[in-house]
Amino acid sequence: MRESLRKAGQRVTVGFDGQAASADVKRLVRDYGAASVILFARNVDAPEQVAELVRELQALARDAGHELPLLVAVDQEGGRVARLRAPWTEWPPLRALGRLGSA
């Protein structure tokens, strides 16, 4: 693959439907060097499922020659936007932390 495509891919965050990595997201990580994956409610079920999903994606990136691990993000703002709910630790919304004025 052309180096320019891999460099572009390193700046891309990809998402996907379902609780298993889709063929498209695997191709983007493997063939185009996508360096970041974001998870939404549609991707998460239980801690064990998410851990296995992340392990699979990290192994795919490693096997594809990524120099660094994937950055895996979750759309988790706290409050109403909380993709990881119990049994995960639930944090207050960031605006509540901001109101403390200690930042």
Residue ranges and their predicted role:
Residues 17-30:
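Short, acidic/polar
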